[in-house]
Design a protein with these regions (language model features):
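Catalytic phosphate-donor-binding core of small-molecule kinases
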Residues: 1-47, 56-163
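Oxyanion-binding "anion nests"
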Residues: 53
Length: 163
């Protein structure tokens, strides 16, 4: 959900939300609260908030963990953070995550499962609240295929290559 001085807006995603800078110059600063407690101020190109389903997409490509689909968690993965000590973190899916761009001299984008919304620099302060939806998505699971088999075949996970 996006909150500013106007009406709150709701966005839904199965894989991930990404708050990232728009354009090529500068970093953005994102303050993150977890259940109302200050978690971190990320000084980075952006931040990925992903589900286990989304963990093998953008989050994995920037160093986030692979998370099995049945895990009841949410993953926060910074995009090119300015500090070497900032790492991805895995939180319970019941955690309400609030994020706000606190240094808004750069335009930024909220992307969610291939869609996006742009925000200009110096606009109204906007707080994004991420929480688990009350509804469930049922996915087809083929009995002859297991998640680990898919990881090995599609991502070449754990495959040794000798030259």
């Amino acid at each position: 959900m996006r909150e500013g001085t106007g009406e709150p807006s709701n966005y839904w995603a199965l894989n991930e939300f990404v708050i990232e800078r728009s354009g090529s110059a500068g970093l953005i600063s994102i303050r993150v609260m977890a259940d109302g407690i200050h978690l971190n101020d990320y000084w980075a190109d952006g931040l990925i908030i992903s589900t286990p389903t989304g963990s093998t997409a953008y989050s994995m490509s920037v160093g986030g963990p692979i998370v099995a689909p049945g895990a009841d968690v949410v993953i926060l993965t910074p995009l090119a953070p300015h500090s070497l000590t900032v790492r991805p973190i895995v939180l319970p899916s019941s955690t309400v995550i609030e994020a706000q761009v606190i240094r808004d001299d750069q335009p930024y984008v909220l992307a969610y499962d291939g869609r996006s919304r742009s925000f200009e620099r110096g606009g109204e302060p906007i707080r994004f609240r991420f929480s688990r939806a009350s509804h469930v998505v049922n996915l087809v699971k083929l009995p002859e295929q297991h998640y680990f088999q898919t990881l090995r075949s599609k991502l070449m996970w754990g495959v040794l290559r000798h030259g």
